[in-house]
Curated annotation (Swiss-Prot):
NCBIfam families: pdxH (TIGR00558), PRK05679.1 (NF004231). It catalyses: pyridoxamine 5'-phosphate + O2 + H2O = pyridoxal 5'-phosphate + H2O2 + NH4(+); pyridoxine 5'-phosphate + O2 = pyridoxal 5'-phosphate + H2O2. Pathway: Cofactor metabolism; pyridoxal 5'-phosphate salvage; pyridoxal 5'-phosphate from pyridoxamine 5'-phosphate: step 1/1; Cofactor metabolism; pyridoxal 5'-phosphate salvage; pyridoxal 5'-phosphate from pyridoxine 5'-phosphate: step 1/1. It comes from Christiangramia forsetii (strain DSM 17595 / CGMCC 1.15422 / KT0803) (Gramella forsetii). The gene is pdxH. Substrate binds at residues 9-12, 68, 125, 129, 133, 193-195. GO terms for biological process: pyridoxine biosynthetic process. This is Pyridoxine/pyridoxamine 5'-phosphate oxidase. The keyword Oxidoreductase applies.
Length: 214
């Protein structure tokens, strides 16, 4: 298998990120960029983010997860704690999250650590999900090896019968994480590959702001 991609390139000319427009708080800029993506007709699932983890095996792993909320404390997402992702974060809570919105020529890379959210918060979010998603969380022992697609569908059918007209309990191994950032990098594509890169690094209760070479 071979394919030459050397000529795959485009010029980025849709925006700029200048010091005069940068707030002191990265959360303000994050919210502004997120809202821009969320309101854009050219962006699907603005809350889709890549999460990179490294467990005790020291092998980096990246997957796309959906951001479910954010506030001044950080970013929230939910998963099966027994999944590869969950095990990695239990062994090493440091991780990296990134958002890329190609149509806006914007990217945000965030470094930080996670903590598990309260069982109450996980319960509240779990029961806000569609019923099918709740059943799916029970049917799938995430990241485990299964014999076939049919095996999964049979489990779902049995669970549908088991919880017919009943409330579906949250699986004990399912819950949320709060990702607490220590660094934000905002990337804005620019012409001639002279992109804007602004780095916020947390220092005690303040943020240090620096421009990085592209």
């Amino acid at each position: 298998m071979e394919k030459d991609l050397a000529n795959y390139r485009r010029s980025y000319e849709k925006g700029e990120l200048l010091e005069r427009d940068i707030p002191d708080d990265p959360y303000i800029l994050f919210e502004s960029w997120f809202n821009l993506a969320d309101n854009s007709k050219n962006v699907e699932e603005a809350n889709a983010m890549s999460i990179s983890t490294v467990g005790k095996d020291l092998m980096p792993k990246t997957r796309v997860v959906l951001l479910k909320s954010f506030d001044p404390d950080g970013l929230y997402f939910y998963t099966n704690y027994d999944s590869v992702k969950g095990r990695d974060l239990d062994e090493n809570p440091k991780c990296c999250i990134s958002f890329f919105w190609p149509s806006l020529e914007k990217q945000i890379i965030i470094q930080g650590e996670v903590v598990k959210v309260s069982s109450k918060k996980s319960e509240e979010y779990f029961h806000s999900r569609p019923r099918g998603s709740q059943l799916g969380a029970h049917a799938s022992n995430q990241s485990s090896v299964i014999p076939s697609r049919e095996y999964l569908e049979e489990r779902l059918t049995k669970l549908e019968q088991k919880y017919l007209k009943k409330e579906i309990p949250k699986p004990k191994e399912w819950g949320g994480f709060l990702f607490k950032p220590v660094a934000f990098e905002f990337w804005q594509g620019r012409a001639s590959r002279l992109h804007d890169r602004i780095l916020f690094t947390k220092k005690d209760d303040n943020w240090k702001i620096e421009r990085l070479a592209p």
